[in-house]
Structures are given as structure tokens and as C-alpha cells.
Amino acid sequence: MREDDTHLPTGCGALDELLGGGVERGTVTQLYGPPAAGKTNVALTTAVTTAAAGGLAVYVDTEGLSLARFQQLLEARATDPEAASANVIVSDAHDFDEQAQAVRDTADFADRADLIVVDSVTGFYRLARGGDDTTGDALRQVADQITHLLSLARKHDLAVVVTNQVFTDVDNDSDRARPLGGHTLAHWTGTVLRLDRFRGGTRRATLEKHRAKPDGEHAQFQITDGGIDAASADDY
């Protein structure tokens, strides 16, 4: 599906413009935000959009993917939903060890994949670390997974999307939610996109790191039956 040799479309024009054309090949894009911010919907819509265009998406699911939502997106975005479904390889992980194995196994598909998604890369890390965001063994394992995915992205010129959860940094005299893994994970991701949800359901995506665009740029989007679509500033 090499219509654009450098980016994969997310399925939302506003997000694609924000990201400089879509999700970039050859690097890792991190989506983070609080619950219901739209992380899974952005990741899944990107995967389905890739599959509908004839590309192969590998989706490591640690969150319990809704098959009904998956089917809904296929029917909305693919002219042949059954064929598109065959282009999405879903691997379920139920604990930290299974996640690590699933991430390693993505290498088996890397030579023909266009996109690898891990949703979420830090869910089991949150459980392992308890209430303290430390750089212990659990974080090192997550960092190892990210660097493995980054090496696949660079070697095979594919795109990687990982979703990340948040915590409240009470030690920083702020109630602002911050991404789990902090600077460690940000170091290994080429793009960091923060997602927020506003009253009425409108979401905002804000660039916090990008290899070619300034930090702070943002776009509004909304979640629909067909995935994700642009929203105007008047909607929130």
C-alpha cells in the first residue's frame, strides 16, 4: 500500500495534517492520555484504514479489544470488510509476560507489515509498578519492547503506534496527568501525541514531540460510528 512512502493515514484528515501526513514510518508514535481520551479509537482506526488500503497491520491487544467495534470500523471504512479483516493480525496478551512475547513475535510479520500497534504498552506495567513511577525492572522491560519495535520500524520501514496510560505526578506540585514511563519511553518514540477529552465528547490531540514539527500544535477530532473524524473548535 505504498501510496505515501513516509506516512500511514490515521483515517482522520485533521490528525494526518497535525502529524505531517499521518503516522510516520521508520519510528514509533506514542499516543497517551486519560481513560476515554480516544487512544484505542485512534490506534484501531489507523489499523483498519491501513488494512482497508491493502496493507498489513499487526495489533497487540492488552486492553480487551471490542470485536463489535472492530467490525463496525471495517464495515465503515473498507469496501470489502472480510478482506480487510484478514489484513489485521490481532494478538491478545493477558499479562506482562504474554505482552513481551507478543511484541517479540511481531518480528515474524515485520517484513510484510506496514503497521504494528501495541494497545496498551503500559497497562501491565502500571500493575507491576504499583503506585510509584520508578525506573525498575518493569519499566526496563517496557523500554526493551519499545526499542525492539523501533528496530523493526527502522529495518523494515514500517510504522509503530503504542498507546500509553497516565498518572498524576503528586511530587511535582501539579495535578496534571503525565505519561507512564516518562522520559524513558519518550526518548525511544519519535512522535508523542497527547489526547484529551472535553465536555460533549470532542477530543484534542496535541503534539508534544515530533521530528519535523513544533511542539504544541493541536487538532480537534471526534469519535464516530465510522472511527475518528475532524471536529471544529466550536464543538468543545
Curated annotation (Swiss-Prot):
Record's keyword terms, sorted: ATP-binding, DNA damage, DNA recombination, DNA-binding, Nucleotide-binding
Q: Which domain of life is it from?
A: Archaea
**Organism, scientific name:** Halobacterium salinarum (strain ATCC 700922 / JCM 11081 / NRC-1) (Halobacterium halobium)
What this protein is reported to do is described as: Involved in DNA repair and in homologous recombination. May regulate the cleavage reactions of the branch-structured DNA. Has a very weak ATPase activity that is not stimulated by DNA. Binds DNA but does not promote DNA strands exchange.
Name of the protein this chain belongs to = DNA repair and recombination protein RadB
Annotated PANTHER family: DNA REPAIR AND RECOMBINATION PROTEIN RADB, RECA/RAD51/RADA DNA STRAND-PAIRING FAMILY MEMBER
Q: NCBIfam families per the record?
A: PRK09361.1-1 (NF006861), recomb_radB (TIGR02237)
Q: Which Pfam families match?
A: Rad51
Transmembrane annotation, as ranges: none
Q: Which GO terms describe its molecular function?
A: ATP binding; ATP hydrolysis activity; ATP-dependent DNA damage sensor activity; damaged DNA binding
